[in-house]
Amino acid sequence: MRPAFRSTLFYIALLLTAASAPAAAQRVVPQRVAAHRWSEVTRRFEAFARAAGVIGGSAVLVRRGAIAARHHYGLADRTGARKVNDRTIYHWASVTKTLTAVAILQLRDRGLLALDDRVTRWVPELREIHDPEGAAEGAADSITIRMLLSHSSGLQNPTWPWSSGEAWEPFEPTAWSQLVAMMPYQRLHFRPGSRYGYSNPGYIYLARVIEKITGDPWAVYIQKNLWTPLDMHRSYVGATPYHLSADRSHGYRVAGDSVTDLGADFDPGITMPNSGWNAPVDDMARYIGFLTGSPADPASRARHGGVLRRGTLREMWSPVVETDAALPEFAAAGLGFFSLESAGRRIIGHTGDQAGYRSYLYVDPASGNGIILAFNTTNDRGAGEREMAALAAEAIAALRP
């Protein structure tokens, strides 16, 4: 998560609370967005895009699992002059972690694991990680499923901390064996369960648990148990399927007047369970509908309940550990989701930043409202922060009935 955007994310979460507060004992689901309000959102969106040098992006308001309003900007492919549109596929980076978390809770609800189980039951290789406190029983044996989900395990943040930045290097380790070979050269950074510390590899280990229990590769399990029943048929990980390639956005890196095209596809390797998700905004709207249980038709609501119980989702959003100064926009980490309490309401969400793509997912579960912001550009100089905050304010205000 890039420091330049942290204050912006606080505005998003805070304003979402104000924008969707319901009357007592009644869910408020706005039916339409005032034309003048959405016009101001699009103006702010374009002001940020110009200030930050964004090549392409989308802002989307979601109600009851469907897109209520959207605004697309710029190009999905600069060289080919291909515009962003309804079908454009973005990379959602760390928002992927929420899928892995949902999958783990599915297995818990089926009685196949417990949140306080030791992870080394399925991933014994973790015992090779150095314990600087020299406990008689390695500290890795005290890491639980719950700790991995809530980023409180003591494991490091980056999956591969030794990159030299050479163009020929793989983007990330590509095989489980490579990750295992690294373990004796890593250490725990704090006592497991004692505090918060964001960890990308923790979600790779959760995926390993899923694979050991089910026998399915992580991506196959997600396809069968989340995307298919939720009608998210254009979501995928890894290389873009041929039939979707015309819709895939490129990623871009901007530094001053210099723009680098990072291409459409890249290999996230072993990190797919923490950052591999690619999808159009329509699929993300369906995902918000699942999280909130708010689709208009009863058949969809029933199908969503078969994916994961409402009570389990609420459990996932409950705070487990307070975040630290590195994550000021959220007060707490839950089980795969971050949360902020404001005016008695809980806002949940996750963000992503990888390979030129930035993504923002924020949801008010009580009202069923959500906001999605997606960009295909990283600005190495953090330009446009003030404009981004103004955009967030207007976008969230548009949720009001």
What residues fall within each predicted segment?
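Bacterial N-terminal signal peptides that target proteins for export
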Residues: 1-10
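Bacterial N-terminal signal peptides
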Residues: 9-19
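Sec/Tat signal peptide C-region and signal peptidase I cleavage site
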Residues: 21-24
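Catalytic loop of the DD-peptidase/beta-lactamase superfamily, centered on the K-T-G motif
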Residues: 26-71, 160, 166, 211-216, ...
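Short, charged, amphipathic alpha-helices and their helix-cap/turn boundaries
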Residues: 37-41, 121, 165-191, 216-235, ...
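Active-site SXXK
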Residues: 39-48, 59, 65, 89-116, ...
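Active-site helix/loop module of the DD-peptidase/beta-lactamase fold
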Residues: 57, 86, 91-95, 107-156, ...
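Short glycine/proline-rich turn/loop motifs
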Residues: 80-84, 181-190, 263-271
